[in-house]
Curated annotation (Swiss-Prot):
Binding residues annotated for NAD(+), in chain numbering: M325, D344, V401, V402, E403, K408, S430, N454
Binding residue positions for substrate: D296, N501, Y661
CDD domains assigned to the protein according to its UniProt record, in alphabetical order: crotonase-like
Region (3-hydroxyacyl-CoA dehydrogenase): 311-723
Pathway: Lipid metabolism; fatty acid beta-oxidation
Annotated NCBIfam families: FadB, PRK11730.1
Designated name of the protein: Fatty acid oxidation complex subunit alpha
Reactions accelerated catalytically: a (3S)-3-hydroxyacyl-CoA + NAD(+) = a 3-oxoacyl-CoA + NADH + H(+); a (3S)-3-hydroxyacyl-CoA = a (2E)-enoyl-CoA + H2O; a 4-saturated-(3S)-3-hydroxyacyl-CoA = a (3E)-enoyl-CoA + H2O; (3S)-3-hydroxybutanoyl-CoA = (3R)-3-hydroxybutanoyl-CoA
Organism: Vibrio cholerae serotype O1 (strain ATCC 39315 / El Tor Inaba N16961)
PANTHER family linked to this entry: TRIFUNCTIONAL ENZYME SUBUNIT ALPHA, TRIFUNCTIONAL ENZYME SUBUNIT ALPHA, MITOCHONDRIAL
Amino acid sequence: MIYQAKTLQVKQLANGIAELSFCAPASVNKLDLHTLESLDKALDALAADSSVKGLLLSSDKEAFIVGADITEFLGLFAKPEAELDEWLQFANRIFNKLEDLPFPTLSALKGHTLGGGCECVLATDFRIGDATTSIGLPETKLGIMPGFGGTVRLPRLIGADSAMEIITQGKACRAEEALKVGLLDAIVDSDKLIDSAITTLTQAIEEKLDWQKRRQQKTSALTLSKLEAMMSFTMAKGMVAQVAGKHYPAPMTSVVTIEEAARLPRDAALDIERKHFIKLAKSTEAQALVGIFLNDQYIKGLAKQSAKAASQDTQHAAVLGAGIMGGGIAYQSALKGVPVLMKDIAPHSLELGMTEAAKLLNKQLERGKIDGFKMAGILASITPSLHYAGIDQADVIVEAVVENPKVKAAVLSEVEGLVDTETILTSNTSTIPINLLAKSLKRPQNFCGMHFFNPVHRMPLVEIIRGEHTSEDTINRVVAYAAKMGKSPIVVNDCPGFFVNRVLFPYFAGFSLLMRDGANFTEIDKVMERQFGWPMGPAYLLDVVGIDTAHHAQAVMAEGFPTRMAKSGREAIDALYEAKKFGQKNGSGFYQYTVDKKGKPKKAFSDDVLAILAPVCGAPQSFDPQTLIERTMIPMINEVVLCLEEGIIASAQEADMALVYGLGFPPFRGGVFRYLDTIGIANYVAMAEKYADLGALYQVPQLLKNMAQQGTSFYSAQQVSAL
C-alpha cells in the first residue's frame, strides 16, 4: 500500500502501475475537503515513489465521483474572499499536481462523474468508461461555475464550442456522446474496465501512446484564430443570453471566463477562472440555487425517513375519477412501477384518462426515454373500470372526483366500505378541508389529503395534508408513495387552501388592490415576470388557473380568513367571472388566447377587456416597478411567515421548496425565506410597514418583528444537508 486514507487508497499493481481508488465509507464518493487533502498527500506519495510508472484512477462505487460536497458550499462561500481564493488555489494545486506527475495517468470511469469529479479526471491524460458513464459539469445549475479547472481544461481537450455547451447548460454527457466529443477515449464492457485501463496505461508507459502531447494540449493556450474566437464566443453569448437570461449570471460568466483565458497557458487561465468563480460564489443567486439543492436533499431525506418508518410499501394503487387529472395521476403511478386501477362512473371520462396516459407515454417514446415494449407494459398496468372490482387490492386510493365536498365525501365513504382496515384513502383537493371530508369516514386515521398540481407529470410538488385524526403511519405511507411516483412530497397541516393556495391568494389580492388603485395589469405582469422572475405574472397566472376556479377558491379563502382575505368590494376576478371570461380554458380572460401550430394557447392583449375591468379599476396611474413588486409580494410573504408561525408548514426549507415546486417561485431567489434573508429581515419589516394602511394583508407578522430586533435569519451561512 502506497497510501491509505478514509476516502481513498493507493496500491501498487503489476508492471509499475499504481491504482488510486476512491472508496469513501458513504454510499457515494464526493470531493469534500477531507478527500481533497487526502488526494494531495496521495499524489505526494506517488511522486516520491520512483517505482511508479503509471497511475490508474478508479472508484469502488457504482458512480465514480458525484462531485464536490455541496453541503460545504454555503459555509465556504460565506468566508472572506481571500479565504475562498486560498481554498481554490489549494484545490487547483492538487489537480495541477495530478496533471504534472512524471508518468501517464488514466481514469477508469463508471456511473456519474460530475462537477469536481469531472474536473479531477480532466487532469488525467486518458479517460475510458463503461456504458453507464455519465460525465459533466452541472455547476451553472447551482449559480456558480467550475472552479477546479473545468473552464480551462475542457475547452482545450474538446474545443471551446463543445465545452461551452456542456458548461453553460450544466449538462452531463452519456458515454456515447462523451466518446463522440472527446471526453472519453474509449467505451469498454464493465467487467473489462480495469483490464482495459491497465492495457492502455501500459501502452502509454511503453510510449506507444503519446501521453505527453495530450498533456501539452491541456496546459497550453487554446488554438483558435482571432476570427474563430470572435465567431465562437459571440455566438455562445447570444445563445446564453437568450436561454439563461439576466437572472442567472453563471452561464454567461462561464463563457466570458473561457474567452478571457483562451490565449493564456494553464496557470494564468486558472487565475481567470478563480476570479470569476469567487464573484459568482458571493452572489445571491448562488446562495439561492445552492440552497434549493440542499433543501431538495432535505425533502428527499424526509421522504426516505417516512418510507423507512411506514408500516408497508405501496404495491398497488387506485384513482377514483378519471379525466385529465385522474389520467395524469394514473400515468405517473404506472410509469414509476405502481399498477393502478382507474375508476369512474362515465365511460367517456375513462377514455379521456387513458388517452391522457397514452399521450404522455407517446411523448416519452418520441424522446427515446422508453421503447414500445415498455410503453405497452405501463399502459397495461393502468386498469380502467366502471366498477369497484379489484379496489380491495389497492394499498393507497387517490380520490380525484369533482371539487364538490358532498360528492367527494360520498365517494370516500362508499369506497371505505369496500376496502380493509389497512387501506389508505386520500383526497386530491385544492380547497376542501380535509377535516371536513374526514367526518364522512369511520377510519379518519387512515385518511389524508394528497394535492397534486396540474399538469401532474410536470409539477414536482405534492402537498400531503394532515387532518386532525390522520395517523403518522398514514402520512408516512402516503409520503413514501408520492416519492415513489417521482414527486416531492411536502407535509402540511389542514387549513383553508392548505399551504400553496393559502399563500397564493394574498398575492392575487395584492394584485387586485393595485388594479383598484389604477395600475395596468399588463405592466404588473411585465414587472413580475421580467424583474422579479415569476414564469407568469398574476393576471396571466389567473388566466391559466381559470378565473372560475380562482373565483371559487377566493370565496373559500375569504371565509377561512375573513380578517385578511375578505373582499371589500368587487374585484377584477369578479368582473371577469360575471362576464364568463374564464381565461385560457375558454379563450378569454385578462388576455385573449388562440391556439398556435403546436396546439398551445398563445396570449395576446385586447382592448375589449378594459371595458369589463373599468368598474373595478381606479383612474389609470403609473407605479414604479419596485412598488409593483412590493405591493404584490408583501401579502404573500406575510402569509408564508404566518404559515410557519402557526405550524401549517414545518420548516423554512419545506416552505421554500413548496413555493418553487408548486408555484414556480423564481429559483434564483430561493423561496420566500431565502429572499427575506437576502434582503434582510429588518429591511423587509421597514419596507412592509410603509404599506400598513392598505389593510390586514400588509401587517407584518410578529415573528418577523422579533427576528428583525434580534438580527436573526432563517438560514445560517453554514446550512447543512438533511438527514
